[in-house]
Amino acid sequence: MKRVLIFLFAWTLVVFALQAQTEIDKAMFRAMYKFSYKTSPEQPTFDWVDWMYLDIGNKATMFYNRYAELKDSITNECLKQNIAPEAIHERTKNYPVRGDAPVYCQLYSEKTTRVATRYTKGYYYEEPMVMPQWILDNKSLTLYGYTCLRATTHYLGRTWEVYYTTEIPLSYGPWKLWGLPGLIVRATDADHYFLFELDHFKRLSKPELIIYIHREFGNKGGYTGSEYKKVSKKTFVEYERLFHKDVMAFLDFEMGDIIRSTSGDPAPATEIPYIPLEK
């Protein structure tokens, strides 16, 4: 049974691994954040860590899961070689991605935030870019080699404490946090469910494309699959909740069929506990 489920997950990875790409900007800078988080309020310590990239251009930023990007790249090369789904799973299992891996695009020229994710199908929503209402104070700390100042805000349902540095005069940060006089170096919520920490920052030696993925990979290769479906933010959040509540049931919903084991029984419920960043 375990082998069957591994195959199903691996095949799902193959189906949605490659998507159409559109250039939205060129990244001049890159910040890497360590994203530690709990998956249940009762946990005394963080349960998981994701490594996140923030690519920064002149008119847009993109915040994304580095391991998810690596898995896509490896899958791409494997598909070109007609490698079997189970073998692809073996090659990508060292890059664990917990749950879905949303990509956050801040389109400053359009004053729009675009959030996209994929299960077996792709979805996205857009919302106006609203800058957090920051309260600045004079508390100063040296964090990760930078002199930082403190700021707080109540934003998208949670109270955040952040430290930013004017040594990097870019008004960006992890997730949807932005609008300070310098790069956000550390951010945590009042409940201590989430912690973003700057691991390193660099100016890229040459500009790299910031790519927005919006089309599913075709059955025979190439970016010829269905366009990501635009949904309301409310629907997007509900899909995220349903996916984490029972992965298999959500895949049944998307595929219009019931995933079954070799015995013919429906695949057992598979829950991925999580706490949403917004509430």
Regions found by a protein language model. Name each.
Residues 150-213:
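Gly/Pro-enriched, hydrophobic low-complexity segments
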Residues 143-144, 155:
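Structural motif
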Residues 1-26:
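Bacterial Sec-dependent N-terminal signal peptides
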Residues 21-132, 137-140, 147, 161, ...:
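Extracellular or lumenal secretory-pathway regions
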